[in-house]
Regions:
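Conserved catalytic-core motifs of GNAT/GCN5-like acyltransferases
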Residues: 8, 28-34, 99-101, 127-130
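Short, charged/polar surface micro-motifs in flexible loops or helix N-caps
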Residues: 46-50, 57-59, 82-84
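Mid-chain, well-packed structural core segment of small domains
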Residues: 75-83, 89
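Core segments of cupin and vicinal oxygen chelate
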Residues: 2, 10-50, 54
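N-terminal beta-strand motif that seeds the catalytic metal site of vicinal oxygen chelate
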Residues: 1-16, 72-77, 125-134
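Acetyl-CoA-dependent GNAT
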Residues: 54-58, 124-126
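Vicinal oxygen chelate
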Residues: 42, 86-134
Length: 134
């Protein structure tokens, strides 16, 4: 079976975005690339690689500017303590967006936006089909 191990997100400011995810979720910086079309900082929790991307502009072909391209809607982090995670998110500049699901049924997630407006969620129970979701 294939396993999801990499998510890439376009951001406005690489360092600011990296600091946010390092501070809030204790992700480790595992790499950086600076190439002709842009730059990337790679973070990881040891299982999944989160690539933060900043493109230099249009690639010189008929593709739309990557920052405006259709792509991922959001991603999620499983946390040990929902309230503590929310405190850390907001202290680092993230903004609460909305709650989704029913906490009594174990399918609850709390949605936020990072300082660039990228949507992500947190869950104490995980998501259907993952190890943490009962």
């Amino acid at each position: 079976m294939a396993r999801l191990r990499h998510i890439a997100v376009c951001v406005k400011d690489l360092e600011k975005a990296a600091k946010f995810y390092e501070t809030v979720f204790e992700l480790k910086r595992v790499g950086r690339e600076d190439i002709e079309i842009g730059s990337a900082i790679y973070l990881s929790d040891g299982v999944v690689n989160l690539a933060l991307l900043k493109f230099a502009g249009a690639r010189g072909n008929d593709l739309a500017d990557p920052a405006n391209a259709v792509g991922a809607n959001h991603f999620g982090f499983q946390v040990d303590d929902l309230a503590e995670a929310q405190r850390r998110i907001e202290a680092a500049g993230g903004k609460f967006f909305f709650d989704l699901g029913d906490a009594r049924k174990g399918n609850f997630e709390r949605k936020f936006k990072d300082p660039d407006g990228v949507l992500f969620d947190i869950s104490q129970h995980g998501w259907i089909g993952t190890d943490g979701c009962g």
